[in-house]
From Swiss-Prot:
Belongs to the MurCDEF family. MurE subfamily. GO terms for molecular function: ATP binding; magnesium ion binding; UDP-N-acetylmuramoylalanyl-D-glutamate-2,6-diaminopimelate ligase activity. SUPFAM superfamilies: MurD-like peptide ligases, catalytic domain, MurD-like peptide ligases, peptide-binding domain, MurE/MurF N-terminal domain. UDP-N-acetyl-alpha-D-muramoyl-L-alanyl-D-glutamate binds at residues 27, 29, 44-46, 157-159, 185, 191, 193. NCBIfam families: murE, PRK00139.1-1, PRK00139.1-2, PRK00139.1-4. The lineage of its organism: Bacteria, Pseudomonadati, Pseudomonadota, Gammaproteobacteria, Enterobacterales. It catalyses: UDP-N-acetyl-alpha-D-muramoyl-L-alanyl-D-glutamate + meso-2,6-diaminopimelate + ATP = UDP-N-acetyl-alpha-D-muramoyl-L-alanyl-gamma-D-glutamyl-meso-2,6-diaminopimelate + ADP + phosphate + H(+). It comes from Shigella flexneri. This is UDP-N-acetylmuramoyl-L-alanyl-D-glutamate--2,6-diaminopimelate ligase. It is found in: Cytoplasm. InterPro entries: Mur-like_cat_sf, Mur_ligase_C, Mur_ligase_C_dom_sf, Mur_ligase_cen, Mur_ligase_N, MurE/MurF_N, UDP-N-AcMur-Glu-dNH2Pim_ligase.
């Protein structure tokens, strides 16, 4: 571990900061240890300055604290022999501080940011897989977890704290990573968690209703996503031109790469572009023909559904924009694998096809059902619910979508959290024209079992909402549960 010193860390902001050797950087006083730097920020739920005495008692070497209402910017105090340096707007500066602390890890690998409501996980995984096939040592950071490909460790949030993000990136650099695809959430952008990162390329997948319990309305949600392009080192922008928001952004980003599978591109109006010219769906995926600023080609994809064609094209355009040769990308495309819990297909002789997907927004559920329909000769079943203590407005919308696009809707629990499961189900049913035709079953494992056992061999059962997750939150408890494991057991362990 390279030497870290408080004076060097704060040189751009506080030239007269004292010299102190530093071990680690933390926002959590509970894990602060001897020699650490404790950073006391004012958060949405707690004021970290209240925990300064605890951090001092645990032997920290120094403290950086929010100056607002306490001190002037750059003011230095001492508490029990521990220097406390106050900085104003500490949340906004935290990413830069952590970047200096961890020796600017985003300078030492090729970092691609991916934002949007749906498709972030699949697109980042495709970017990491594809770049590794071309010789990079690739990593991912996001919803499924952080780590080198094949060594991903689960995480709580899509985008961690500003300190966590820089720390994770530094760890990946230490492990030899040369390429990292990172999901960038709207929360992470608004809360400045990636403010000091340098992205040679940034991808926008789409925008639809989600997180309105946090952002309030779609205008603020869109504004949060736009921060990646307006306030960050986003490098080359790659934008989905099939999305209405994407088309608005392309008008503001003349150097962006436009990507489309719905003929929303006029090559004369965009600097660089990539578009599908023909897509044929089959049992094992899709055959995609495309044209682009870099040339034309054909790809055999093992991913299910139209939206995954879009995700793959976005990944392809990004790697082309970064300079990877088209010929090499085409040679390796057939080796790309589906992503865990993202339109993941489970089959067994004599049983229905079961698809497990993370779709938990109205738009994602509609697209997942449309994708499953392309591969369904019989009835299409949909097992889903909605999370408790989250945006209630999307529940009836998802009910209406399940009723319209599935032949059989099975409404059940997702993560009810502290809400009554039946109340959530009732909110979903309120969006259906004929709720009496829906099957209602509160226990999720029981609902999945019911659907899989009742469905016929040529039916498809979409189990939506949890994807890769291996837990269910009921009340304040985090219980062991996995749709993937449940389905695999029902099909005799064959996936």
């Amino acid at each position: 571990m390279a030497d870290r010193n408080l004076r060097d860390l704060l040189a751009p902001w506080v030239p007269d900061a004292p010299s102190r050797a530093l071990r680690e950087m933390t926002l959590d006083s509970r894990v602060a240890a001897a020699g650490d730097l404790f950073v006391a920020v004012v958060g949405h739920q707690a004021d970290g300055r209240r925990y300064i005495p605890q951090a001092i008692a645990q032997g920290v070497a120094a403290i950086i604290a929010e100056a607002k209402d306490e001190a002037t910017d750059g003011e230095i105090r001492e508490m029990h022999g521990v220097p406390v340096i106050y900085l104003s707007q500490l949340n906004e500066r935290l990413s830069a501080l952590a970047g200096r602390f961890y020796h600017e890890p985003s300078d030492n690998l090729r970092l691609v940011g991916v934002t949007g409501t749906n498709g972030k996980t699949t697109t980042t995984q495709l970017l990491a897989q594809w770049s590794q096939l071309l010789g990079e040592t690739s990593a991912v950071m996001g919803t499924v977890g952080n780590g080198l490909l094949g060594k991903v460790i689960p995480t709580e949030n899509t985008t961690g704290s500003a300190v966590d993000v820089q720390h994770e990136l530094a760890g990946l650099v230490d492990q030899g990573a040369t390429f990292c695809a990172m999901e960038v959430s709207s929360h992470g952008l608004v809360q400045h968690r990636v403010a000091a990162l340098k992205f040679p390329a940034s991808v926008f997948t789409n925008l639809s209703r989600d997180h309105l319990d946090y952002h309030g309305d779609m205008e603020h949600y869109e504004a949060a996503k736009w921060l990646l392009y307006s306030e960050h080192h986003c490098g080359q922008a790659i934008i989905n031109a099939d999305d209405e928001v994407g088309r608005r952004w392309l008008a503001k980003l003349p150097d962006a790469v436009a990507v489309s599978m719905e003929d929303h591109i006029n090559p004369n109006c965009h600097g660089r572009w990539l578009k599908a010219t023909e897509v044929n769906y089959h049992d094992s995926g899709a055959t995609i023909r495309f044209s682009s600023s870099w040339g034309d080609g054909e790809i055999e994809s093992h991913l299910m559904g139209a939206f995954n064609v879009s995700n793959l094209l976005l990944a392809l355009a990004t790697l082309l924009a970064l300079g990877y040769p088209l010929a090499d990308l085409l040679k390796t495309a057939a080796r790309l694998q589906p992503v865990c819990g993202r339109m993941e297909v489970f089959t067994a002789p004599g049983k229905p096809t079961v698809v497990v997907d993370y779709a938990h927004t109205p738009d994602a559920l509609e697209k997942a059902l449309q994708a499953a329909r392309l591969h369904c000769a019989g009835k299409l079943w949909c097992v889903f619910g909605c999370g408790g203590d989250r945006d209630k407005g999307k529940r009836p919308l998802m009910g209406a979508i399940a009723e319209e696009f599935a032949d059989v809707a099975v409404v059940t629990d997702d993560n009810p959290r502290t809400e009554e499961p039946r109340a959530i189900i009732n909110d979903i049913l309120a969006g259906m024209l004929d709720a009496g035709h829906a099957k209602v079953m509160e226990g999720r494992a029981e609902a999945v079992t019911c659907a899989v056992m009742q469905a016929k061999e040529n039916d498809v059962v979409l189990v939506a909402g949890k994807g890769h997750e291996d837990y269910q939150i009921v009340g304040n408890q985090r219980l062991d549960y996995s749709d993937r494991v449940t389905v695999a057991r029902l099909l005799g362990g064959i996936a």
